[in-house]
C-alpha cells in the first residue's frame, strides 16, 4: 500500500510540474484488515493475543499514511517553486545585409537632382504669369496715354479759349501790350524784357482765366482777347472789354425763361436769386468820352442813363426796365437749352403809364358822381 501511494504521488508530481502551485490535502480512514484463519481458536488466551496484534498493525498503517501525505505535499510545493524560477525565454534574430549595387543591372541610376520635374513645371508657369503681367501693364499704359490724348483733344474742342486758344490769345495780348509800352522808349533791351515778363506771367494768368466767370457763363472771348496793333488805341481796347462784359454775362430771368419759372415745385423764394434778377446797374466806362458815359451801351439811340425821376413815364420806359435784346440772348438760350424764344411770353404786356393816366382822367370819381346826382335832383 505504501509503495502504491508513493508511486501515485510521484506520478502526480510529474503531471503537476508545469501547473500552478496548489495545496493538496488527503485524508485516509484506517480500515482494519484481518486475514482469514483456517485454524479454529480453542483457547481464550490466543484470541486476545490476535486482537492485540491486529490493533497494533492498524495503528502502524495509519501513522505511515499520514506521514506519506505530509511528505508528498511538501515535495509538490518545492518542485513547483523550482520550476518557476528556472524558466527563461531566448530568441535569435538574423542580421540582414543588402547586396552591393555595383555591377547590378537591375538597379536604376540617375545623375539629375531630386525634384527636377517640379522645378521645370514651376518655371514654365512663372514665365507665363510674367508674360501676362507685362502684357497687362503695357496695355494699361497705352490706354492711359490714349485716353489722356482724347481728353485733351475734347477739351480743346469744347473749350477753345480755356486750353490752347485762350493760352495763345492771352499770351499775345500781354506780349503785344508790353511791346507797345516799351517800344516808345526805342530800347530793344526793354522790349525783350517785357516779352520775357509776359511769358513768365503767362501760366498764372492762364489758370486764372480758366477758373474765371468768363468760362462759367460761356461768353465769347473774341473781343477781349483780340490782338491789338500799334494803330489801336487804349480806347478801342476798353470798348472791346466793355462790349465783352455786356454780351457775355447773363443772369437767370424768370420772364425770359417762362417755362422753367412756372414749373417750379418749391414755395421757397431765395432772396439771392431775387437780388440777382434785379436790373443791373451799369458801370461807367472810364476810357469813354463824356457823351458815351451819359448814354447806355445797350441801345443805339441816345437815352439818358439815369432818367428824370420827376417824370414817371420816363422811368417806366427807361432802358433798364425794358427788355434788352442783345445778340448773345440766342446763344444764352441755346446753351441752356431753353425754349423761351420758341414759346410766346405769358407775362402780360405793360401799357405806358401816360396812357393809363389819360384813361383815369376821363373816369368820374365818387365825389363827382354824387355831385351829378345832386345837380339832377335840383
Curated annotation (Swiss-Prot):
The chain crosses the membrane at residues 118-138. Residues 321-337 have a biased composition (Basic residues). InterPro entries: PRM (IPR051009). Keywords: Membrane, Transmembrane, Transmembrane helix, Vacuole. The keyword Membrane applies. Its main location: membrane. It is found in: Vacuole membrane. It comes from the Eukaryota. One of its GO terms (cellular component) is fungal-type vacuole. It is a single-pass membrane protein. Residues 18-70, 299-368 are annotated as: Disordered. Residues 25-41, 48-70, 343-356 have a biased composition (Low complexity). The keyword Zinc does not apply. Belongs to the PRM5 family. This is Vacuolar membrane protein CAGL0J10076g. It comes from Candida glabrata (strain ATCC 2001 / BCRC 20586 / JCM 3761 / NBRC 0622 / NRRL Y-65 / CBS 138). The lineage of its organism: Eukaryota, Fungi, Dikarya, Ascomycota, Saccharomycotina.
Amino acid at each position: 500500500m505504501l509503495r502504491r501511494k508513493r508511486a501515485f504521488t510521484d506520478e502526480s508530481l510529474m503531471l503537476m510540474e508545469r501547473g500552478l502551485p496548489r495545496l493538496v490535502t488527503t485524508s485516509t480512514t484506517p480500515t482494519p484488515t484481518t486475514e482469514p484463519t483456517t485454524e479454529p481458536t480453542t483457547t481464550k488466551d490466543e484470541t486476545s493475543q490476535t486482537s492485540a496484534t491486529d490493533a497494533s498493525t492498524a495503528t502502524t498503517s495509519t501513522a505511515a499514511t499520514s506521514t506519506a501525505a505530509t511528505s508528498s505535499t511538501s515535495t509538490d510545493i518545492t518542485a513547483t517553486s523550482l520550476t518557476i524560477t528556472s524558466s527563461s525565454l531566448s530568441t535569435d534574430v538574423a542580421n540582414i545585409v543588402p547586396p552591393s549595387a555595383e555591377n547590378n543591372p537591375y538597379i536604376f541610376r540617375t545623375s539629375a537632382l531630386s525634384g527636377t520635374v517640379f522645378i521645370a513645371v514651376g518655371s514654365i508657369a512663372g514665365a507665363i504669369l510674367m508674360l501676362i503681367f507685362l502684357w497687362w501693364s503695357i496695355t494699361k499704359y497705352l490706354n492711359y496715354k490714349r485716353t489722356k490724348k482724347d481728353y485733351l483733344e475734347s477739351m480743346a474742342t469744347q473749350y477753345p479759349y480755356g486750353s490752347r486758344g485762350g493760352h495763345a490769345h492771352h499770351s499775345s495780348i500781354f506780349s503785344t501790350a508790353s511791346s507797345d509800352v516799351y517800344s516808345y522808349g526805342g530800347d530793344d533791351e526793354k522790349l525783350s524784357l517785357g516779352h520775357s515778363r509776359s511769358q513768365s506771367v503767362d501760366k498764372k494768368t492762364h489758370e486764372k482765366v480758366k477758373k474765371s466767370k468768363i468760362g462759367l457763363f460761356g461768353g465769347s472771348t473774341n473781343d477781349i482777347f483780340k490782338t491789338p496793333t500799334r494803330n489801336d488805341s487804349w480806347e478801342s481796347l476798353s470798348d472791346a472789354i466793355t462790349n465783352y462784359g455786356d454780351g457775355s454775362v447773363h443772369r437767370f430771368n424768370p420772364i425770359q425763361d417762362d417755362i422753367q419759372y412756372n414749373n417750379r415745385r418749391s414755395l421757397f423764394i431765395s432772396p439771392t436769386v431775387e437780388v440777382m434778377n434785379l436790373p443791373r446797374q451799369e458801370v461807367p466806362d472810364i476810357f469813354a468820352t463824356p457823351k458815351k458815359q451819359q448814354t447806355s451801351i445797350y441801345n443805339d439811340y441816345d437815352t439818358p442813363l439815369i432818367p428824370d425821376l420827376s417824370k414817371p413815364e420816363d422811368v417806366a420806359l427807361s432802358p433798364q426796365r425794358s427788355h434788352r435784346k442783345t445778340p448773345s440772348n440766342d446763344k444764352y438760350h441755346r446753351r441752356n437749352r431753353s425754349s423761351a424764344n420758341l414759346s410766346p411770353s405769358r407775362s402780360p404786356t405793360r401799357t405806358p403809364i401816360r396812357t393809363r393816366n389819360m384813361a383815369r382822367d376821363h373816369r368820374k370819381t365818387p365825389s363827382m358822381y354824387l355831385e351829378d346826382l345832386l345837380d339832377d335832383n335840383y
